[in-house]
Amino acid sequence: VLKQGDDERFRLLNAFKDDTGSVLFATDSFWEGVDVPGDSLSQVIIVKLPFDVPSDPVFTARSELIQQRGGSPFMELSVPQAVIKFRQGVGRLIRRGDDRGVVVCLDRRIMEKRYGQIFLHSIPDCKRMYAPLSEILGAVGEMI
């Protein structure tokens, strides 16, 4: 079991690539510039949709500008930025034509909120399942 913060990023990635039985726990910062083709990466688990922190000063300033012109900061800024990060996370899994794997998103909002469809439509077509976690785990076990 490897986790972000235990070692330098490049060392963690090398250890993860070298041991196909390892598990790497990391935040969305590992979604950019990471290439782990082949059997080392077979699953990506997204615990929550990657929305930016609304208290960030740059985010707050952009939100205020959108609001001043009568727009929706959530739909015009928060959702598009989160969708880009989400696509990056999903994109870690399939890097070559022969790669296969499973993405599990544990955030119910992807299915229960109207904006969740924007996330789903942003990724390539694939088999999708919305079910209790126990059923999802069983299906993942069969796929891998």
Protein language model features and the residues they cover:
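ASCE RecA-like P-loop NTPase motor cores
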Residues: 1-144
